Amino acid sequence: MSSTLSAYRNALRATRIAFRQDLPILQAARMQLKQGIRDNSNLQTQPEIEEAVQKLNDVAKFLIQNIVQGEKQQDGKYFLNFHEKTELGDNETIKQGRKEMGSLAGKKGNSIKSCKD
């Protein structure tokens, strides 16, 4: 039970970090969390409970690392509100994948085959 409570608190904390400047979305996210806890309150076996707790921890981690709120500025551009826990990638994996894939504008890459091949 304590791991469940800890996961729930972590998820609430994650919603506060991810949606700190957007009260309607924060409230909706917290309602979803509460509903999910209620829906899973009837789980009986330890593996089911552990799976639900792990899923809740994964959701909290995803919210903290991947959700960034943005505000539209007067000039039409968006200001993104990054925080210290936001995961910032370097796009290296995207660049590596393009070498293998080739162009999708008609030229066939190494890993792309047509139906005629």
From Swiss-Prot:
Residues 1-10 form a transit peptide. Its main location: mitochondrion. InterPro entries: Complex1_LYR_LYRM7, MZM1/LYRM7. GO terms for biological process: mitochondrial respiratory chain complex III assembly. It comes from the Eukaryota. GO terms for cellular component: mitochondrial matrix. It is found in: Mitochondrion matrix. One of its GO terms (molecular function) is protein folding chaperone. Keywords: Chaperone, Mitochondrion, Transit peptide. CDD domains: Complex1_LYR_LYRM7. Interacts with RIP1. Belongs to the complex I LYR family. MZM1 subfamily. Assembly factor required for Rieske Fe-S protein RIP1 incorporation into the cytochrome b-c1 (CIII) complex. Functions as a chaperone, binding to this subunit within the mitochondrial matrix and stabilizing it prior to its translocation and insertion into the late CIII dimeric intermediate within the mitochondrial inner membrane. Modulates the mitochondrial matrix zinc pool. This is Mitochondrial zinc maintenance protein 1, mitochondrial.
